[in-house]
Amino acid sequence: EIKQGYSIKRIGFTGDFNTEAKSVSVSPIEPLPRCNVVVGECTYSDPTRCYSMKKDRWYDEQMINAAICQYNRILMPAFSLQRVEDILDVLWRTRATERKVDGQMIPVYLDSPLACRIYRAWSEQLDYEDKLNLRLIESWEESQAIQQSNERAIIVASSGMLNAGRALAHLKYILPNSRNAVLFSGYASPNTLAYEIKHGAKEIMLDGEMIQNNAQIYCLNTFSSHANYNQLMQYYQNIDYDKLCLVHSE
């Protein structure tokens, strides 16, 4: 609120939102109160971005299941807050990781110190360590050992756009091998490494070294934290404002 004399003006900011997203670590979006100006996101404002969460999530789950069955090592770059939780939930519900390797479930490595701290904060609600054979990797030494291993595994690491984080270190070992796969689960800005790989780059520059991209690349469509066209229209039609300023648009 901005007060000037007896006049009070209210500006509201939506931030990123998805009206269908469910999470134990992020509260559902609530309608803004009456505002003079609303500054709202419209990342996926193109009507062609519409999708059915239930139907299209099923397709994503089938894609994940097929990748786990077919490939040796799978890297899933992910944002530490909420996205990691969504991925772990889908891995558990698809039951794909229950396939046995040497009598054990396929291990799922959560290789991100921040994501591990968030997971521990919500461990009672999430509880995937036994369900998924989930292993929390916090030290750099543990991460290096996993990077250089050739065991069958699923690695969930930040960052989602590959502009920082341990996912970059894993890429060096994942990409050259055609028996490996990378599963992207979110938006990638045009100036990011994730964008290059998603759009077919056959080689990338990483730490001054040219790395061949022989891995299989998958793009999942239903993990975004941004509302699609229909959700945006419904949300903005149901809040009260004098002026709407749309930002963060395609």
Q: At which residue positions do the language-model features occur?
A:
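A short, acidic, amphipathic alpha-helical segment used as a generic capping/interface helix at domain edges
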Residues: 61, 165-174, 224-239
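His/Asp/Glu-rich metal-coordinating catalytic cores
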Residues: 1-86, 90-104
